[in-house]
């Protein structure tokens, strides 16, 4: 078991999805259901600005961070694919506010035994309580230390989207225009409230905020 400590000097563009996740969860971004502002918590802007810089480093186009903390950008189509319908990918930056959401310490468990997972805070997760754990035998798991949330909902989605962008670029994979958007306040049901569809620019889009690998939900009400 490894306890991850983020170092601000280890920022770089070439990253795997889990490395990006470990970076993003160091940002505290709980939304606030009692707020009348958008975003409901100013701290969400800190992550948004960081992501904007990363998107600029990936040479995305049409990058816009608006005054309500919606962040948009595009990966232009490769030559010959300019007329392919644009596809979009969306994830949210906020986390839940009703659990401990600060001083998050990611823990990496390699080669999981498939039976039980003991976290540093003294909590044990067992396959009897959480049967899905049995399907993760011999895989690498990323959790919190058990005293806080991790924030993978939905920072894992953000990490997956930007890693996909980098993979498309460096793999020289042909594609149409890829539109991405990172939104605030999804956890309090307001994520789509001020979403700028025209700025986003996609013909079709997926929200990367799921559960089981390979699962697709073809509609949602506020994400």
Regions found by a protein language model. Give the residues of each.
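Active-site-proximal helix/loop capping residues that flank conserved catalytic or ligand/cofactor
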Residues: 1, 19-22, 53, 159, ...
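Short, Lys/Arg-enriched N-terminal segments with co-localized hydrophobic residues
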Residues: 1-14
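Intrinsically disordered, low-complexity regions enriched for glutamine and histidine
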Residues: 4-5, 42, 46, 90, ...
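Intrinsically disordered, low-complexity regions
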Residues: 11-13, 74, 115, 123, ...
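Generic structural signal for short, solvent-exposed loop/turn connectors between secondary structure elements
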Residues: 13-16, 57, 68, 173, ...
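Acidic/His- and Gly-rich active-site-bordering loop/insert found
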Residues: 15-140
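Acidic/histidine-rich catalytic neighborhood of metal-dependent amide-processing enzymes
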Residues: 134-223
């Amino acid at each position: 078991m490894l306890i991850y400590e983020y170092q601000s000097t280890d920022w770089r563009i070439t990253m795997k999805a889990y490395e990006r996740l470990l970076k993003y969860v160091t940002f505290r971004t709980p939304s606030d259901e009692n707020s009348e502002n958008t975003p409901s918590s100013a701290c969400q802007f800190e992550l948004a600005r960081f992501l904007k810089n990363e998107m600029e480093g990936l040479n995305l186009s049409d990058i816009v961070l608006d005054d309500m903390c919606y962040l948009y950008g595009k990966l232009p189509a490769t030559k010959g694919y300019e007329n392919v319908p644009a596809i979009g990918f969306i994830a949210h930056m906020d986390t839940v506010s009703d659990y401990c959401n600060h001083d998050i310490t990611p823990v990496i468990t390699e080669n999981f035994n498939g039976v039980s997972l003991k976290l540093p805070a003294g909590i044990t997760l067992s396959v009897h309580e959480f049967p899905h754990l049995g399907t993760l035998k011999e895989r690498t798991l990323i959790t919190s230390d058990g005293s806080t949330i991790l924030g993978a909902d939905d920072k894992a989605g953000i990490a997956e989207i930007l890693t996909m962008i980098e993979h498309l670029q460096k793999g020289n994979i042909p594609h149409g225009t890829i539109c991405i958007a990172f939104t605030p306040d999804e956890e309090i049901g307001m994520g789509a409230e001020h979403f700028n569809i025209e700025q986003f620019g996609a013909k079709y889009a997926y929200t990367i905020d799921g559960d089981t690998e390979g699962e697709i939900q073809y509609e949602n009400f506020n994400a």
